[in-house]
């Protein structure tokens, strides 16, 4: 990665002075903007695109919240910050930042209330189809495998995917509401403005150089600069250097906008901020809806299972791509299989596992043994190897099924492997950027995918919008407070 070097303040003549500059107006930047204004700051927010929203606007809109939010309570679910933290410590690891997760869980209910207060509504209804936003406007869903092994043993299973009240994907609607909150605030928004580099004075970030209409302007920020400029999934050089597997064949499934090019991260590094986990990325391999497709089994190149198929699709995708090189089939039959929203079809069919294995180029004896062992246990209603839940256990290829088949989920054969980056700048519980010694880089903040995610190794849907808006708020507020010191 090539850092974008900061410019010394002694070489700059500032054109404007404000309290806080926010770079990027996706969900993280919008919440930082509103929070800084609520704290009394004079805020200037710049957005590289003509229309704000970023990757957030194209997302499903799930926000990972819990600990007993009013929506959870209204839907009949009991949760606590401690239960939420127990799940996240395990599900997002290994290597999680425990302090940030604990702060997130303790403040989650208050954050829900704040989102509602600035105009983001939620309907008190639960959707029982997990791992994605509801097809209607139901507000609550299981979104991270909370109800599947091994996490159902580490914490009480509770849904925490909160979707704003909108039919189907709600990311655009969320950004409409957050954008309206920004518009109602006294913040000034400059679109089509590209941050060029940070300005530093004796190690403190004191401003930013901005290109607007091909003219450079120097903006001084008394309280600090909040970098909320996205991740780096569309910077091919950074992806090749840090997480090459995230460069999946179909560019449409590298989730982000062209502006997710790592510029905010590179600017932060150029001002002295440290990075972490640039090698970590999310990879979702959706298998539905309907989730009933999980009654099939996933096998690798060796013809063996490698995961419980009823778990979170992001966990399946990560294991499939990182550990199995994207060589995966789902073994099913003509009774278990059913039409699905993704159009997944049985690509190969046979009467015996050995015959099917020849089509799949996997060891026949291994696939036959896998099916035998699985069917024997499934007939008893158990899965001692991977602990798939009873509703998803059914012998495969036995009467009334007429044979067995395989859905082709290989990464280079058209299956959806949706990736985005999770690594970024190191930050504390207030969104302040840290250097390699763990000290704050004075005047510098980061949120959203410019900052390293709470998801240290694995993901849960809604974490990006969750930690982006949560720590974006904190960053904006802390920068505003710093302006008054």
What are these regions (language model features)?
Residues 197, 368-458:
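A glycine-rich dinucleotide-binding beta-alpha-beta segment and adjacent secondary-structure elements
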Residues 38-59:
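Glycine-rich FAD pyrophosphate-binding loop
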Residues 103-216, 236-237, 371, 378-405:
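Conserved redox-cofactor binding core of oxidoreductases
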Residues 64-104:
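Glycine-rich active-site loop/strand segments that organize a redox cofactor
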Residues 169, 213-285, 465, 471-474, ...:
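Glycine-rich loop(s) and the adjacent beta-strand/alpha-helix scaffold that form part
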Residues 257, 261, 265-267, 271-368:
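An anion/pyrophosphate-binding glycine-rich loop and adjacent beta-alpha core
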């Amino acid at each position: 990665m090539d850092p974008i070097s900061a410019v010394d303040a002694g070489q700059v003549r500032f054109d404007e002075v404000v309290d806080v500059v926010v770079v990027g107006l996706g969900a993280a930047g919008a919440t930082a903007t509103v929070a800084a204004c609520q704290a009394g700051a004079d805020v200037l927010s710049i957005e590289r695109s003509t229309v704000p929203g970023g990757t957030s606007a194209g997302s499903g809109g799930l926000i990972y919240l819990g600990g007993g939010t009013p929506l959870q309570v209204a839907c009949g679910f009991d949760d606590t910050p401690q239960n939420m933290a127990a799940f996240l410590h395990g599900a997002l690891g290994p290597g999680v930042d425990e302090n940030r997760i604990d702060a997130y869980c303790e403040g989650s209910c208050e954050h829900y209330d704040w989102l509602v207060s600035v105009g983001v509504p939620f309907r008190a209804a639960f959707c029982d189809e997990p791992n994605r936003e509801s097809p209607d406007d139901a507000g609550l869903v299981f979104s991270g495998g909370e109800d599947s092994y091994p996490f159902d043993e580490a914490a009480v299973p509770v849904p925490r995917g909160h979707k704003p009240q909108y039919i189907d994907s709600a990311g655009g609607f969320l950004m409409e509401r957050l954008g309206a909150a920004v518009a109602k605030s006294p913040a000034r928004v400059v679109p089509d403005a590209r941050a060029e580099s940070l300005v530093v004075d004796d190690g403190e970030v004191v401003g930013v150089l901005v290109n607007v209409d091909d003219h450079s302007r120097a903006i001084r920020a008394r309280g600090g600069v909040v970098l909320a400029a996205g991740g780096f999934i569309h910077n091919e050089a950074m992806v090749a250097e840090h997480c090459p597997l995230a460069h999946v064949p179909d560019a449409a499934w590298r989730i982000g906008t062209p502006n997710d090019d790592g510029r905010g991260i590179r600017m932060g590094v150029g001002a002295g901020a440290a990075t972490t986990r640039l090698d970590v990325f999310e990879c979702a391999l959706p298998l539905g809806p309907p989730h009933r497709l999980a009654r099939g089994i996933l096998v690798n190149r060796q013809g063996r299972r490698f995961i419980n198929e009823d778990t979170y699709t992001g966990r399946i995708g990560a294991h499939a791509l990182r550990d199995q090189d994207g060589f995966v089939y789902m073994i099913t039959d003509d009774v278990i299989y059913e039409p699905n929203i993704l159009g997944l079809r049985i690509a190969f069919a046979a009467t015996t596992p050995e015959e099917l294995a020849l089509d799949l180029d996997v060891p026949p004896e291994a696939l036959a043994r896998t099916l035998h062992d699985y069917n024997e246990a499934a007939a008893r209603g158990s899965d001692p190897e991977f602990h798939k839940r009873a509703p998803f256990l059914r012998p495969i290829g036995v009467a009334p099924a007429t044979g067995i088949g395989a859905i082709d989920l290989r990464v280079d054969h058209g299956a959806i492997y949706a990736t985005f980056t999770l690594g970024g700048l190191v930050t504390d519980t207030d969104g302040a950027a840290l250097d390699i010694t763990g000290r704050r880089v004075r005047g510098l903040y980061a949120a959203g995918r410019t900052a390293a995610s709470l998801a240290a190794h694995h993901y849960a849907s809604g974490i990006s919008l969750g930690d982006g808006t949560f720590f974006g708020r904190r960053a904006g507020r802390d920068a505003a407070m710093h302006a008054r010191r």
